[in-house]
């Protein structure tokens, strides 16, 4: 089975080709250009490099979120368009789950993986997993301890320490790198890994779950948090109310 996978949850994002659960190639995007401008060219360049035609793709995969609202919309719309034209189905994969799978290869059963993505506004998108020991990229390989959420780094760390006073984990993602000092200060046993290119993991996970593929129109983004524009509007309204109370 041939899979084309996209990740547009970060500024750079990535595009990958996967065949028979093997990553053929994965390429990071040019963060200086918007996803909308560069994605079509990046997809054509990658498929041409391996002499794949878009009509040869059996399954399309995309990071469903969380991440940049604009990036998510562009990535999902791109995959929907390609899948619709070629009459293929689509699998959406959580970027946090893909992060955890990408980081789990060298971890022993029982190890915990904390996927952290920078959510801006001094927050992180987080999810917590535990390695079960089943085959890599199988659904049973990771067990979700805590599903996708958004919060401040200190609040997340405090919550997990309440879960286990001796809490430690492998933290992965750009959010983990950004807040590495707080993570390591909480426990010297915590390990921080950088954000990998996710499209490859997304493609392998999608092929593993091909039986769950849906029609292109059925893919829905995983936002976790409301758009920044709405949050900024609410903050202005709250500030205006507080100001009026003081008059």
Show which residues each predicted segment covers.
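N-terminal beta-alpha supersecondary unit
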Residues: 1-66
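Surface "functional belts" at beta-alpha junctions
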Residues: 22, 34, 89-197, 213, ...
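Residues at secondary-structure transition points
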Residues: 30-38, 69, 73, 77, ...
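Short, hydrophobic alpha-helical segments
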Residues: 47, 206-214
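DPxDG-like acidic metal-binding loop motif
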Residues: 61-95
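Short alpha-helix plus adjacent loop in nuclease-associated cores
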Residues: 98-102, 202-208
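Nucleotide/phosphate-binding catalytic cleft detector across ATP-hydrolyzing
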Residues: 233-247
């Amino acid at each position: 089975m041939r899979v084309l996978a996209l990740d547009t949850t970060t500024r750079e994002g990535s595009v990958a080709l996967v065949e028979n659960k093997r990553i053929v190639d994965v390429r990071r995007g040019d963060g200086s250009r918007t996803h909308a401008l560069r994605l079509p060219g990046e997809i054509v360049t990658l498929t041409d490099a391996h002499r794949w035609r878009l009509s040869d793709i059996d399954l399309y995969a995309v990071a469903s979120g969380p991440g940049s609202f604009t990036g998510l919309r562009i990535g999902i719309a791109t995959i929907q368009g390609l899948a619709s034209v070629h009459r293929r189905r689509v699998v959406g994969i959580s970027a946090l789950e893909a992060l955890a799978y990408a980081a789990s290869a060298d971890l022993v059963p029982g190890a915990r993986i904390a996927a952290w993505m920078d959510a801006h506004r001094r927050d992180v998108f987080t999810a917590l997993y535990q390695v079960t020991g089943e085959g890599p990229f199988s659904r049973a390989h990771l067990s979700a301890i805590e599903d996708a959420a958004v919060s401040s780094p200190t609040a997340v760390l405090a919550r997990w320490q309440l879960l286990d006073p001796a809490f430690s984990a492998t933290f992965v993602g750009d959010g983990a790198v950004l807040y590495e000092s707080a993570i390591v200060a909480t426990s010297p046993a915590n390990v921080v890994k950088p954000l990998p290119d996710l499209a490859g993991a997304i493609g392998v996970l999608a092929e593993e779950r091909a039986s769950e593929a849906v029609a292109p129109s059925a893919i829905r983004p995983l936002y976790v948090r409301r758009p920044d524009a709405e949050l900024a509007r609410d903050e202005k309204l709250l500030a205006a109310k507080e100001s009026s109370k003081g008059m």
